[in-house]
Amino acid sequence: MAELHIIGQIIGATGFPQNSLFCKWGVHTGGAWRLLSGLREGQTQVDMPQTGDMAYWSHPIDLHYTTKGLQGWPKLHLQVWHQDSFGRCQLYGYGYIHVPSSPGQHRLQCVTWRPLGSWQDQLSEMFVGGGPQLRSPDLIYSGADRYRLHTVGMGTVELELCIILRHFDRYGVES
């Protein structure tokens, strides 16, 4: 079968309202893809930079897939969270990015967004914290009902991925 290796890292995030950020990530694929090695999801550590607004995670990603076709090419979905001084966590943004289909090293930026909520939600968020979250994280990468959401743009997550394709031509999979 054709093989895909994804090796890289989630470098960090910038442009968020506050520091002390961490990132939950996962990979979504179609039914023809099988994970041979690596973790399908994970979480970075919390980084609270002393200077600047860039939170650095340098979180490794190392995945090895086999596939019979290109349908359902892997997508990386991200959730950026803020942890306050009391240890409470608040969602700061959702985002997703398609894994590049060309071999080589790629530096990527994933823009993030979060649901806006009503003015009552926004007022409550200002005083109590929290805020609206998606009921189903599948909405992050499937565009079915995402167009109906009222959202606000948040920061950007930087990634560096190296893509290795193996035996795609041998098995008739054209990339």
Swiss-Prot record:
Quaternary organization: Part of the tectonic-like complex (also named B9 complex).
Keywords (A to Z) from UniProt: Cell projection, Cilium, Cilium biogenesis/degradation, Cytoplasm, Cytoskeleton
Compartment annotation: Cytoplasm, Cytoskeleton, Cilium basal body; Cytoplasm, Cytoskeleton, Cilium axoneme
Top-level taxon: Eukaryota
Protein name (Swiss-Prot/TrEMBL): B9 domain-containing protein 2
InterPro entries reported for this sequence: C2_B9-type_dom
One Pfam family hit: B9-C2
